Amino acid sequence: MDTLQQSPPAEPEGGLRRNLKKRHLLMMSLGGTIGTGLFIGIAEPLSNVGPAGTLLAYLFAGTIMLATMMCLGELSCAFPHSGSFQHYALMFMPSPCWSYTIGWLYWFSWVFSLAADLTAAGFIAHQLFPAVPVYMFCLAILLILTAINLTSAKSFGECEYWLSAIKVFAIVLFICAGGVMIYSLMGHSDWHPTLKTDGMWFPHGWEQIVVCMTIVIYSFQGVELVGNAAGETESPHIILPKVILGIGLRIILFYGLAIAVLALVYPHELTPNGQSPFVWVFSHAGIPGADTLMTLVIFSAAVSAANSAIYASSRMLWSMAGDRFAPACFGKTNGGGVPVYAILITALLALVSLLTRYIPAQQFYLYLIASTGQVGCLAWITIGWCQYRFRQSVRNGTYASDLLRYRSPLFPWTARFVIITNFAIMVGTWFSEQGVVIMLVELAFMIGILLSWYLFRPTLSRLRNTVG
């Protein structure tokens, strides 16, 4: 990177094809953040920090997400690549070791997330059809999603578009139902909004919001998929600037309104028992079949998350193969322009979900979620750092200014905000209930990956020649 770098090539390398369109990108990122973390996981913050604290925590996490999206948007418009921040880390981090480490960490986290999502979907389907064991549903869903992803990126995009549309429709319906419920309750003199209860805004103290953030932030992670998809999107430098801000604002709007409804009507003193607060609101709003409706929505959310996991993990492995961080076979594509071997190895490892034949599904799901830990925060920190280094490189003349097709606002404060807040959230995780387990699991993975780097690292001179 000693000479002025010009615009990257218009077409992706390695056989990938630009089959994704703007609507795929928008719905993929929008639906990617609406999952079981919102539908079920929100019960825990509501109980621990109260409705007002939960609303503040989600709005703050949404702000971090929007700032991260802006940083990623600048990088993806300049260098559309399916490896996203892993490839950018190779370009802008002082040592390729971090690109190698975050790439493998992120891939493993998606593989475990895939197994967890398959377990969740299988468990939900088992509740509807008790005669069929959980592991059989896991296998069937995995085979179907693998076949879809092996066809083309467009097939993945269409599948994800409609699965995400179901979730978005459920959120809109929930907001409308909650609005009707609030309007009807306003006529009763004995009704009081639950936003402030027992004379307190924060039942267990405002400091619990910091601990709550460690749960809340994971609900938004996955939105960085837009960076992976940029490498297979038509005219990414034109589409991405239009999509980035729209995605962020829509997510904050949907989350904000949905949580505001819960904050006004959902009793915070209810102990989390596995039931979705959304089901509680639908039931009390008088909508028949609310339990079945939300069960189907949560099932589609789990399948959607599994679909995204196959896509994200396979593209990350494809990128690392191109950067000589993984075997070259994972960089090969089929006639549909998809990395076939990367998809197959991801699906093969996800068969760990079949262990639900021997381990209770709910317990196994928690094990897998704990294994993913803080990788999402590390990915967001990497995005903020790379955007900061890229903008500095443009200023000192290393890269041409015409690469700034989209400018992240408030530089350098946006990047600094992303880095500092995500680091603080990682530290806050240590004080959560599962913090020690998460920290130890992630530390073990990181040490193992770092050891493999020093044992099998490629020739750096050859590696550097592939970047730019």
Give the ranges of each region predicted by the language model.
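C-terminal membrane-solvent junction of multi-pass transporters and transport-like membrane proteins
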Residues: W162-L163, C329-V340, W380-E433, L463-G468
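Transmembrane helix-loop boundary segments of multi-pass membrane transporters
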Residues: E44-G50, T119-Y135, K154-S164, S276-V279, ...
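Membrane-interface loop-to-helix entry segments
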Residues: G122, Y135-D190, Q221, I244-G248, ...
